[in-house]
Amino acid sequence: MNCCICQFSVRVPKDIHTDTVGHPPVLISELVLQCTRGTNYVLTEESSTICKKCCEKLARYHKSIQIARKLRGEILELIHSPYMSKDHKQTSYKEDDLDRETTISKFDGNIEEAQQQDEEEQELESVGTTVTLVGPAGIVEEVAEEEHTFIIKQSEEEDEFHSVDLELDIDNEIIINEEEAHEVEEVAHEIEEVAHEIEEEDLLPHDKQEAQEEDFFKEDTMSDFDEHLDGAIEYIISDGEDQEQDNESSGEYTVNIQCPSCPEKFSSRRAYNVHTKREHFPGYVCDQCGKTLQSYSGFIGHLQNHEPVKQFACPVCPERFSRKFRLKHHMAWHSGETPYQCDVCSKRFVHKVALYKHKMIHDSETKRLECQVCGFKTRTKAHLERHMRSHTGDKPFACPVCNKRFSQMYNMKAHLREHESPGTNRHRRFHCSKCTHTFINEQNYDAHVQRDDCTPV
């Protein structure tokens, strides 16, 4: 069974339609559909298994969504909460409109007195300075004042006042002619007294209490925000503070990590992680061939060798490859070029990697492993194991077609290619000048020439 996401074989599968992850629990299939929304991915009924790695990624994805939703709610609460008391205050103003009508009615008598000043206001109209008063009866009066203007507007749809402007700065108004301003000074003074009276009555005790409650609410909200912020900062630097307290006398920051599996101690977490992975980590074991790999990327690449999708085809022969660099290396065999030469023994190679590995043969310092039979030295344990098969005669690799056995894997693969496409195993670069024999490697060609047993053409 293969994972429905990474398409690799699953050793301990989970059913995405029945198993859940996260808290609160959610079906794995729902998370898969949520992650792949907007893509061409189709979740079929057959693809019902998922591997452990992909399941852990979906669990982290689900957890991040829950954290994001929680943080969004807290942010929106901080944004909207300070205005809730203000909206409540505006609502209370509307409830007190009837009480204000009684207060504003006191101003109506002054409106009638202002009507008698019609001639004086017409003179003010000529100099272009006006103040508009709209009364309940719809009478429009124009009065000039130097410091305060009281404006009352009556709605055409409702029979109540929406707002009363108590103070209006008129510094930007047109300056009234001093000779004509004194004519309306008395009327403006009366309007100012009424406005001041309304202002005092407007500020009721419960309004003062609401204002105090609003200030208290803002302070309480900010205190909650400060607590969250302090908690986050404390969570981040808690470890550092503990270490600083422990080393306060010395003034230095040190870490002492004890490995639970061995007596080793480390001064940094990075060094501890490297030690654990190199010495105590069992590695990633392939469930098909049993091979152990230390890195996860190497393990994924190894799994692709078992079930490869060979999408890169050779234009010369029927060979296909799962990776592009392997096709590039294969094409070098068709060209017959050997651009890389060893500067010690002058041996030439098709690939640079082959030359690099060959140079290690000449480097005696890297040969730390020695064969106990013939004294052959090598730098890797795998190479020593392959060499030991030449002494033991062990041939663990069998051809699946003819059951012929080989001591090395690459020999078996080369033999198997002959079954699949005879004559196209590899490009035979070495041709005998005396006969029709061709050879893949130079060693076989040299042995053929030295024997001199070929038939002339």
Curated annotation (Swiss-Prot):
Gene3D superfamilies found in the cross-reference section: Classic Zinc Finger (3.30.160.60)
Subcellular compartments: Nucleus; Chromosome
GO molecular function annotations of the record: chromatin binding; chromatin insulator sequence binding; DNA binding; identical protein binding; sequence-specific DNA binding; zinc ion binding
Domain ZAD: 3-84
GO biological process: chromatin organization; regulation of DNA-templated transcription; regulation of transcription by RNA polymerase II
Highest taxon, organism lineage: Eukaryota
One term under GO cellular component: polytene chromosome
Chief location category: nucleus
SMART domains per the UniProt record, alphabetical: ZnF_C2H2 (SM00355)
Pfam family, one: zf-C2H2
InterPro entries cross-referenced by the UniProt entry: Znf_C2H2_sf, Znf_C2H2_type
Zn-finger (C2H2-type) residues: 257-280, 284-306, 312-334, 340-362, 369-391, 397-419, 430-448
Keyword Repeat found: yes
Keywords: Chromatin regulator, Chromosome, DNA-binding, Metal-binding, Nucleus, Repeat, Transcription, Transcription regulation, Zinc, Zinc-finger
PANTHER family according to UniProt: C2H2-TYPE DOMAIN-CONTAINING PROTEIN, KRAB AND ZINC FINGER DOMAIN-CONTAINING
Its job: Insulator DNA-binding protein. Recruits Cp190 and cooperatively binds to chromatin promoter regions to exert transcriptional regulator and chromatin insulator functions. Chromatin insulators are regulatory elements that establish independent domains of transcriptional activity within eukaryotic genomes. Insulators are proposed to structure the chromatin fiber into independent domains of differing transcriptional potential by promoting the formation of distinct chromatin loops to form topologically associating domains (TADs).
Subunit structure: Interacts (via region between the ZAD domain and the first zinc finger domain) with Cp190 (via centrosomal targeting M domain); the interaction is direct. Interacts with pita.
Identification of the protein by name: Zinc finger protein ZIPIC
Organism: Drosophila melanogaster
Gene name of the encoded protein: ZIPIC
